[in-house]
């Protein structure tokens, strides 16, 4: 029988955004970044109240279809807990639909909030599993949960009926690595950008990416001088160039100048990983072209604070 949680209990969750793929690690590699959404969740007498401030304000639903709300309910169900009502207040700083893990952060925030409300019965692995289920892949969600860099993977059910299993392990990131995001002023649909990918790839391209993922893991942990080589990719970015021409242009421009630039997630954000700042000239040119420049650091894991018992 589900446990009824007390009215007045309140938690605050701070969740980092993330960059997925990191070039070759399609649906596998992720990196938590220092741009954060904060979600306040309180148990109330009845009903549902949702407020959104910042990114997505006036654009996202304010009812039970809001992703944070759906994730809270998923977390509560798994924790075998019930609430009479919820007040959810979202303070969003992660640009939405830009390839910076905003939807994964929302899912992580919801599941983490439910875990805090219920007294933390869920393991870290369960939080990754539940949040990743909303995405269909674990790279962004795992990065937001674990912080730092992650290697993640999916095991599909053999019976075709049960849910996929999502798993991840964290990597210690070299302390000198920083990130610079160039964010275009338009959205990218993850579904649309995925549709352009081929169902099959050549063995030589698969072999190329396997080697670059291995290089990227070493680059992130020990050898940041290998970041340029480690961000090379043949599985997804070449196919997405036609639907994201602005992104492709900037990725190529930066890479031609020696920067480890890649398409962040499904885009359209261009991400640069480096140990030195990107040149002021390039950043000024990006701003003049209408791109928002965000200087970022590698982020710590999601934080859950119980405000009121």
Swiss-Prot record:
EC number of this enzyme: 2.7.1.39
GO cellular component terms, semicolon-separated: cytoplasm
ATP-binding in keyword set: yes
GO terms of molecular function: ATP binding; homoserine kinase activity
GO biological process: threonine biosynthetic process
Compartments it resides in: Cytoplasm
Alphabetic keyword roster: Amino-acid biosynthesis, ATP-binding, Cytoplasm, Kinase, Nucleotide-binding, Threonine biosynthesis, Transferase
Metabolic or biological pathway, per its Swiss-Prot or TrEMBL entry: Amino-acid biosynthesis; L-threonine biosynthesis; L-threonine from L-aspartate: step 4/5
Amino acids binding ATP: 95-105
Class in the EC hierarchy, top level: transferase
InterPro entries associated with the record: GHMP_kinase_C_dom (IPR013750), GHMP_kinase_C_sf (IPR036554), GHMP_kinase_N_dom (IPR006204), GHMP_knse_ATP-bd_CS (IPR006203), Homoserine_kinase (IPR000870), Ribosomal_Su5_D2-typ_SF (IPR020568), Ribsml_uS5_D2-typ_fold_subgr (IPR014721)
Catalyzed reactions per annotation: L-homoserine + ATP = O-phospho-L-homoserine + ADP + H(+)
Main localization (coarse): cytoplasm
Membrane listed as a keyword: no
Function: Catalyzes the ATP-dependent phosphorylation of L-homoserine to L-homoserine phosphate.
Family of the protein in this entry: Belongs to the GHMP kinase family. Homoserine kinase subfamily.
Official protein name in the record: Homoserine kinase
Organism of this sequence: Corynebacterium efficiens (strain DSM 44549 / YS-314 / AJ 12310 / JCM 11189 / NBRC 100395)
């Amino acid at each position: 029988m589900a446990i009824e949680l007390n009215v007045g209990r309140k938690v605050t969750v701070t969740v980092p955004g993330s960059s997925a793929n990191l070039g070759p690690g399609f649906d596998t590699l992720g990196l938590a970044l220092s741009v954060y959404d904060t979600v306040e969740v309180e148990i109330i007498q009845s009903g549902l109240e949702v407020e959104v401030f910042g990114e997505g304000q006036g654009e996202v639903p304010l009812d039970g279809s809001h992703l944070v709300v759906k994730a809270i309910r998923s977390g509560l169900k798994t924790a075998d807990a019930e609430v009479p009502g919820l007040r959810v207040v979202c303070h969003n700083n992660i640009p939405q639909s830009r390839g910076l893990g905003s939807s994964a952060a929302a899912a992580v925030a919801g599941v983490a909030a439910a875990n805090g409300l219920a007294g933390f019965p869920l393991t870290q692995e369960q939080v990754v599993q539940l949040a990743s289920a909303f995405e269909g892949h674990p790279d962004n969600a795992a990065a937001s949960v674990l912080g730092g860099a992650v290697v993640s993977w999916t095991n599909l059910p053999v019976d075709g009926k049960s849910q996929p299993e999502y798993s991840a392990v964290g990597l210690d990131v070299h302390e000198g690595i920083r990130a610079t995001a160039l964010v275009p002023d338009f959205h990218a649909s993850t579904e649309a950008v995925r549709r352009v990918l081929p169902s099959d790839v050549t063995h030589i391209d698969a072999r190329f990416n396997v080697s670059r993922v291995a290089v990227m893991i070493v680059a992130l942990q020990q050898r940041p001088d290998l970041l340029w080589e480690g961000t090379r990719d043949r599985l997804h970015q070449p196919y997405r160039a036609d639907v994201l021409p602005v992104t492709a242009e900037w990725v190529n421009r930066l890479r031609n100048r020696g920067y480890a630039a890649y398409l962040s997630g499904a885009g359209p954000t261009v991400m640069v990983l480096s140990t030195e700042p990107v040149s002021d000239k390039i950043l000024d040119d990006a701003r003049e072209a209408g791109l928002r420049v965000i200087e970022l650091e590698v982020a710590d894991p999601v934080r859950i604070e119980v405000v009121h018992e």
